[in-house]
Amino acid sequence: MAANAFVRARIDEDLKNQAADVLAGMGLTISDLVRITLTKVAREKALPFDLREPNQLTIQSIKNSEAGIDVHKAKDADDLFDKLGI
């Protein structure tokens, strides 16, 4: 597929430079990233990344789970259903 269209965007120069440095470390340019991202959007009909950020409760729950705090275990499905009361 021939690359014959241009995409322009106004962004903060410092942000652009930071991103370019990170991408250069990966062997990519900003143009490479835009091309890869747009290709995935066109193919998958969705963003190739999640824009949602976890709220404080979710963040704390993840930390607790990773630390083994307030983690509930079940021996099998029947035990789980009993603990859930179903």
Swiss-Prot record:
Induction: Not induced by the DNA damaging agent mitomycin C. Transcription is autorepressed by DinJ or YafQ-(DinJ)2-YafQ via operator 1, repressed by LexA via operator 2. One of its GO terms (biological process) is negative regulation of DNA-templated transcription. It comes from the Bacteria. Disruption phenotype: Cells missing dinJ-yafQ have reduced biofilm formation. Probably degraded by the Lon and ClpPX proteases in vivo. GO terms for cellular component: toxin-antitoxin complex. GO terms for molecular function: cis-regulatory region sequence-specific DNA binding; DNA binding; protein homodimerization activity; toxic substance binding. Keywords: DNA-binding, Repressor, Toxin-antitoxin system, Transcription, Transcription regulation. Pfam families: RelB. Antitoxin component of a type II toxin-antitoxin (TA) system. A labile antitoxin that counteracts the effect of cognate toxin YafQ. YafQ and DinJ together bind their own promoter, and repress its expression. There are 2 operators with imperfect inverted repeats (IR) in the dinJ promoter, YafQ-(DinJ)2-YafQ only binds to the first (most upstream) of them to repress transcription; binding to a single IR is sufficient for activity in vivo and in vitro. DinJ alone is as potent a transcriptional repressor as the heterotetramer and also only needs to bind 1 IR to act. NCBIfam families: RelB_DinJ (TIGR02384). Belongs to the RelB/DinJ antitoxin family. Forms a heterotetramer with antitoxin DinJ, with 2 YafQ-DinJ dimers associated via the N-terminus of the DinJ antitoxins (YafQ-(DinJ)2-YafQ). In this complex the toxin activity is inhibited. This is Antitoxin DinJ. It comes from Escherichia coli (strain K12). The gene is dinJ.
